[in-house]
Curated annotation (Swiss-Prot):
Biological source species: Bubalus carabanensis
Gene this chain is encoded by: IL6
Residue positions the entry lists as glycosylated: 38
Positions of disulphide bridges: 72-78, 101-111
Protein name, as recorded: Interleukin-6
Residues in the signal sequence: 1-29
One GO CC term, this protein: extracellular space
Alphabetical list of InterPro entries matching this protein: 4_helix_cytokine-like_core, IL-6-like, IL-6/GCSF/MGF, IL6/GCSF/MGF_CS
Biological process terms in GO annotation: acute-phase response; glucose homeostasis; hepatocyte proliferation; interleukin-6-mediated signaling pathway; liver regeneration; positive regulation of biosynthetic process; positive regulation of multicellular organismal process; positive regulation of receptor signaling pathway via JAK-STAT
Residues the record lists as Phosphoserine modifications: 81
Pfam families linked to this entry: IL6
Localization in the cell: Secreted
Alphabetized GO MF terms: cytokine activity; growth factor activity; interleukin-6 receptor binding
Length: 208
């Protein structure tokens, strides 16, 4: 087989493989009961429907909104000081055009892969929230648990097309700050970006 034929065939094979993964992933809906929500054991097969997964994401978005509001009640300028927030460059996972999650150029398989990878990358930032958030800590614990559950659901849909990134412990140390305002600014920035990330992922979840 010559190289020109191989190079033309490879993208088709990859796309076909992704489509086969997606086709086999969605037709197995099952109940999402209390046992499911309380059990995030790695490797456990989680059966759910796109509607219930969407509801899970919306609950997380509402939780994040409540956490941001809780912080802002203690600081009137927390959401308006964009310059201060911009200085705290945390290299947070974000959706880009190439990730297939935007309305223009939407690709369900690619979007699901990017969503799963991004949520795995967010784990270190959730560790920071767990350590530094001074509001209702139960909200942080619930958010972490729900994101782990969502990651498990999405991993089942994309099979073995993604690997867990290495934990960046150095980043967690670099994020530490004794300045209360800087700390809160980082928390707000993490929550805001995570909320946007989850909202973009909804388009892929809604597709059946």
């Amino acid at each position: 087989m010559n190289s020109r034929f191989t190079s033309a065939f490879t993208p088709f094979a990859v796309s076909l493989g992704l489509l086969l993964v997606m086709t086999s992933a969605f037709p197995t809906p099952g109940p999402l009961g209390e046992d499911f929500k309380n059990d995030t054991t790695p490797g456990r097969l989680l059966l759910t429907t796109p509607e219930k997964t969407e509801a899970l994401i919306k609950r997380m978005v509402d939780k994040i909104s409540a956490m941001r509001k809780e912080i802002c009640e203690k600081n009137d300028e927390c959401e308006s000081s964009k310059d201060t927030l911009a200085e705290n460059k945390l290299n947070l996972p974000k959706m880009e055009e190439k990730d297939g999650c935007f309305q223009s150029g939407f690709n369900q398989a690619i979007c699901l892969i990017r969503t799963t990878a991004g949520l795995l990358e967010y784990q270190i930032y959730l560790d920071y929230l767990q350590n530094e958030y001074e509001g209702n800590r139960e909200n942080v614990r619930d958010l972490r648990k729900n994101i782990r559950t969502l990651i498990q659901i999405l991993k089942q849909k994309i099979a073995d097309l993604i690997t867990t990134p290495a934990t960046n412990t150095d980043l967690l140390e670099k994020m530490q700050s004794s300045n209360e305002w800087v700390k809160n600014a980082k928390i707000i920035l993490i929550l805001r970006n995570l909320e946007n990330f989850l909202q973009f992922s909804l388009r892929a979840i809604r597709m059946k």
